[in-house]
Structures are given as structure tokens and as C-alpha cells.
């Protein structure tokens, strides 16, 4: 895949076009598959290396009307060779902390919210769709026109 990457936008196009991140995690309680932030990062690492890029995260705790949110910003940096300079693109996502989560202390709740917000920042940046395909709901019924 080694192409001449001129800027962060070229890198983003290449990464989005080549990123494969299947939903390999299983939720047995809800009987569905999913991917988490770590899965996305694992799939991204070879592509980041190939395009001379890296990801940096910044988290911010925000309070809105007695609710606490974690605001995660993912920044894709493209290193311009031999110049010690980079160009970047950012994407931000929010996740709300639940007031109580059974079996978790406060730091675990914040950590889980951070991971969730980071996952959705990565989804936005790299055009990862977490929804079911529209055909999933079709049930082999013909479409009707109204």
C-alpha cells in the first residue's frame, strides 16, 4: 500500500479505504457482536505506520445540568518527513457517565465512558459504521412504494 502521502487528508483517505475492523467481540447477554476502542486501534496501527501517522487522544470532563460527560477528541497526526512537523485532523465525541453502574466504582465508570467516547471519535474520523446494515431488517420482504 506504500503510496506517496502528501498530507493528512491523503493519509485519511488511504486509511479509511483500507481499514478492516470486524465486530469480533461477543455480548452473550444481548446476543450481538461489537467492536471496542482497542479493536479499532489494533486494526489502525499497521495503517498508521504505513501512512506515517499517529493518533492522540485528549479527554475532557464536562458537566451539563448535573450530568457528567466525557468529551474525547481523537487527533490524527501526519508526520511530514524530516521536518519534525505534522498536520492533523480532529474528531470529537461525547459519552455520558451513568450515575450508578452496578459492580463499578467511580473511576471505572469514568474509564468506561472515556473508552466509549474514544471509540465513537474513531468511528467518526475513520467512517466506521456501528449500525446494522439496512438489509439486516429486510426479512426478504419486497419493498413497497408509497
What are these regions (language model features)?
Residues 1-146:
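Polyanion-binding surfaces on beta-sheet-dominated domains and ring/shell assemblies
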Amino acid at each position: 500500500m506504500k503510496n506517496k502521502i502528501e498530507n493528512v487528508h491523503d493519509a485519511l483517505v488511504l486509511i479509511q479505504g483500507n481499514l478492516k475492523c470486524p465486530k469480533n467481540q461477543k455480548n452473550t447477554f444481548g446476543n450481538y457482536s461489537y467492536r471496542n476502542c482497542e479493536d479499532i486501534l489494533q486494526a489502525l496501527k499497521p495503517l498508521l505506520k504505513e501512512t506515517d501517522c499517529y493518533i492522540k487522544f485528549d479527554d475532557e470532563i464536562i458537566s451539563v445540568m448535573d450530568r457528567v460527560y466525557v468529551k474525547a477528541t481523537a487527533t490524527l497526526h501526519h508526520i511530514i518527513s524530516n521536518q519534525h512537523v505534522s498536520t492533523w485532523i480532529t474528531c470529537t465525541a461525547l459519552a455520558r457517565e451513568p450515575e450508578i453502574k452496578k459492580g463499578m466504582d467511580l473511576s471505572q465508570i469514568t474509564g468506561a465512558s472515556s473508552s466509549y467516547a474514544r471509540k465513537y471519535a474513531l468511528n467518526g474520523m475513520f467512517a466506521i459504521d456501528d449500525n446494522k446494515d439496512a438489509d439486516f431488517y429486510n426479512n426478504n420482504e419486497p419493498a413497497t412504494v408509497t
